[in-house]
């Protein structure tokens, strides 16, 4: 369906769907790493926020400070989520026409 001025909605919808599929594929392949406590807790996440690795320095476990360990795990996961969100914004912004990347 074409509108005055040559605007083709079907072509735009198809392009948007292709963009969405490309973005989903890139997010699936993306990996981000985050840490907390100076590297005591390390997390690796996929672009869809799935945690694929969580590593804890054994020395922190020996200290029996479970509350501190829990806080570091939460901090590492939150940092990973922040990095994924930043990467998504960056990738999406580079895929959109000039001027539209700032919408997100």
Enumerate the predicted regions with their spans.
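N-terminal intrinsically disordered, cationic/polar leader segments
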Residues: 35-55
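Residue-level signature of catalytic and energy-coupling elements of molecular machines
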Residues: 16, 49, 73
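Long amphipathic alpha-helical segments used for membrane anchoring, targeting, substrate engagement
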Residues: 1-33, 83-104
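A short interface-forming secondary-structure element
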Residues: 54-66
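Short, well-ordered turn and helix-capping elements at secondary-structure junctions
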Residues: 31, 38, 58-60
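Stable alpha-helical structural segments in soluble proteins, enriched in small hydrophobic residues
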Residues: 72, 76-84
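Conserved acidic
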Residues: 8, 65-72
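Short, charged/polar low-complexity linear motifs in solvent-exposed/disordered segments
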Residues: 60-61, 70-71, 87
């Amino acid at each position: 369906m074409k509108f005055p001025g040559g605007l083709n909605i079907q072509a735009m919808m198809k392009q948007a769907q292709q963009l969405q599929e490309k973005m989903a594929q890139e997010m699936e392949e993306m990996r981000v790493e985050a840490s907390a406590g100076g590297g005591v807790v390390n997390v690796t996440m996929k672009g869809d926020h799935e945690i694929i690795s969580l590593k804890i320095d054994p020395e922190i476990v020996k200290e029996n400070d479970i509350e501190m360990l829990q806080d570091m795990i939460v901090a590492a996961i939150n940092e990973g989520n922040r990095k994924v969100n930043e990467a998504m914004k960056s990738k999406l912004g580079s895929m959109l026409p000039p001027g539209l990347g700032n919408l997100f």
